[in-house]
């Protein structure tokens, strides 16, 4: 979630004046501990490639293998970023821009540290997925502040993000020796969701956990109404004359999201309805109104993994970043990246 703005994607869109969210694709090419980032044309969805370092662990000369991999520092490694110009930046400089785009810097320091570890883990884990490309679409990858957006942040804000990265330098989350998929989102509405319920894949460390203290989140509750005609067009259904038949049976997940719901006699998954109707989350209720339906949602995002507002609530009550991460990613272990088994 961009600082003080409701959507990660719209953070860049509003800052740069584009109507749709600006999408940065992070092309990853290993080239002597660096990677090349190239800007694509605006005709290609106004997308910009951003390179993400894939750090190399040096094993030494033949016959002199070290007992353990060296510690990994984001400050010592670098990426090459091509926006309008070519630039060299340390991995932590790249992650600073991610952190500023993902979480309000007014959040507690321990929450910022937790987000820093999650973002670092996400970056190095996904460097080779999707042909080495990631993007800042909030439904897909991480936000990234370009030079103009970065300059809009006061020095104190940039320093708070940099401090969170320094104080967690090189730390990543692992599960059974492998880097995890460190997914995160804005707020859950009180409980996170299980990865199986959202993406159909059972991931032990992405299970449903309580996330108290999110009531103060400005995006925790939302309400949106749709006319009958709009719903019929969006879902390709016919609601009929009997309003009481518009909404049928529903099932719910452990995390409180809609697993499936009948509308107009057809059954839809909660994930599909969220996407088709642009809802903030799958945790919603439906009320029949005169001429249409009202959807009341809790939470913002896919609700799997780290809740950013939940992390801030935990930090405000004294939890350190290690405790926050172990709560939202149960069973995971913090390691320096050089110590993790799978890169």
Which residues fall in each region the model found?
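Glycine-biased, low-complexity coil/linker segments
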Residues: 8-9
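Conserved, single-site charged/polar hotspot
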Residues: 20-343
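Acidic, Ala/Val/Gly-enriched low-complexity intrinsically disordered segments
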Residues: 1-2, 13, 19, 27
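Cationic, low-complexity basic patches in intrinsically disordered or flexible, solvent-exposed regions
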Residues: 5
């Amino acid at each position: 979630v961009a600082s003080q703005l409701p959507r990660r994607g719209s953070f860049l869109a509003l800052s740069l004046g584009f109507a749709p969210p600006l999408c940065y694709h992070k092309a990853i090419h290993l080239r002597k501990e660096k990677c090349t980032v190239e800007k694509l044309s605006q005709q290609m969805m106004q997308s910009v490639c951003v390179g993400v370092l894939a750090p190399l662990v040096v094993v030494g000369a033949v016959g002199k293998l070290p007992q353990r991999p060296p510690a990994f520092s984001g400050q010592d490694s670098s990426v090459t970023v091509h926006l309008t110009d070519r630039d060299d930046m340390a991995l932590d400089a790249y992650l600073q821009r991610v952190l500023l785009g993902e979480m309000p810097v007014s959040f507690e320091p321990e929450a910022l540290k937790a987000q820093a570890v999650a973002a670092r883990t996400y970056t190095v884990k996904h460097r080779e997925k999707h042909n080495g490309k990631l993007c800042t679409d909030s439904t897909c990858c991480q936000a990234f502040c370009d030079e103009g957006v970065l300059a809009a942040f006061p020095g104190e804000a940039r320093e708070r993000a940099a401090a969170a990265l320094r104080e967690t330098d090189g730390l990543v989350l692992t599960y059974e020796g492998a880097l995890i998929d460190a997914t995160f989102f804005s707020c859950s509405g009180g409980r996170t969701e299980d990865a199986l319920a959202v993406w159909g894949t059972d991931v032990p460390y992405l299970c449903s956990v309580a996330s108290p203290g999110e009531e103060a989140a400005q995006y925790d509750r939302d309400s949106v109404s749709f006319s009958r005609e709009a719903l019929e067009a969006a879902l390709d259904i016919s609601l009929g004359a009997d309003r009481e038949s518009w909404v049928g049976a529903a099932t719910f997940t452990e995390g409180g999201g809609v697993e499936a719901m009948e509308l107009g006699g057809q059954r839809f998954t909660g994930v599909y309805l969220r996407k088709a109707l642009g809802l903030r989350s799958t945790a919603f209720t439906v009320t029949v109104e005169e001429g249409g339906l009202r959807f009341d949602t809790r939470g913002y995002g896919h609700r799997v993994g780290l809740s950013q507002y939940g992390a801030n609530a935990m930090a405000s009550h004294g939890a350190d970043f290690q405790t926050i991460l172990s709560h939202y990613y149960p069973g995971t272990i913090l390691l320096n990246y050089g110590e993790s088994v799978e890169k």
